[in-house]
């Protein structure tokens, strides 16, 4: 997948509405996502807004080998990106219904899956036992929004895709093109 910019529309959804809304759209979630969603620090979108998201690989970010989450987060900030807020994964999943199908159909294998788009949001909880971030994946024809656990030592492969915010709602100019 090439570097891609996506305009995302965010709208109010209560925490308890999110699972049913995703289900209605044909999106599957894992148990880690349910745990992630239930955390008290997970903030829902309160008002309708838009943001621009850029999807980039580690290579697009200038890495020449695998990198850890702290290295990726630091580079993202240096490049002018913002870490995506926790709820952005829901809206990005709804916007990217045409994601490439993963070549590896095995779920939960303890590594970053091919074709996944990861969102390194600020951690809701520092404990390794709690999911750290979410990612979007398409397996067979099923769309997934999954949460994952990993520590600061986990190295993401060079081909891993990440989504970062480039403009938030307050900076967005109506009618401009991404």
Give each language-model segment a name:
Residues 1-178:
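A binding-site-centric feature that preferentially detects glycan-recognition modules on secreted/surface proteins
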């Amino acid at each position: 997948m090439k570097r891609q910019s996506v305009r995302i529309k965010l709208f109010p959804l209560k925490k308890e509405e999110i699972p049913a809304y995703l289900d209605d759209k044909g999106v599957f979630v894992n148990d880690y996502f349910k745990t992630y969603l239930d955390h008290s620090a997970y903030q829902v979108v309160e008002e309708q807004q838009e943001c621009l998201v850029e999807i980039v690989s580690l290579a697009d970010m200038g890495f020449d080998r695998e990198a850890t989450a702290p290295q990726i987060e630091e580079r993202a900030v240096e490049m002018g990106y913002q870490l995506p807020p926790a709820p952005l994964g829901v809206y990005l999943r709804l916007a990217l219904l045409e994601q490439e199908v993963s070549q590896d159909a095995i779920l939960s294998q303890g590594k970053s899956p091919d074709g996944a788009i990861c969102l390194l949001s600020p951690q809701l909880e520092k404990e390794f036992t709690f999911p750290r971030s979410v990612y979007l994946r398409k397996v067979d024809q099923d769309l997934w929004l999954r949460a994952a656990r990993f520590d600061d030592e986990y190295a993401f492969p060079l081909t891993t895709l990440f989504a970062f915010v480039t403009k938030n709602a307050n900076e967005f100019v109506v009618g401009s093109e991404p």
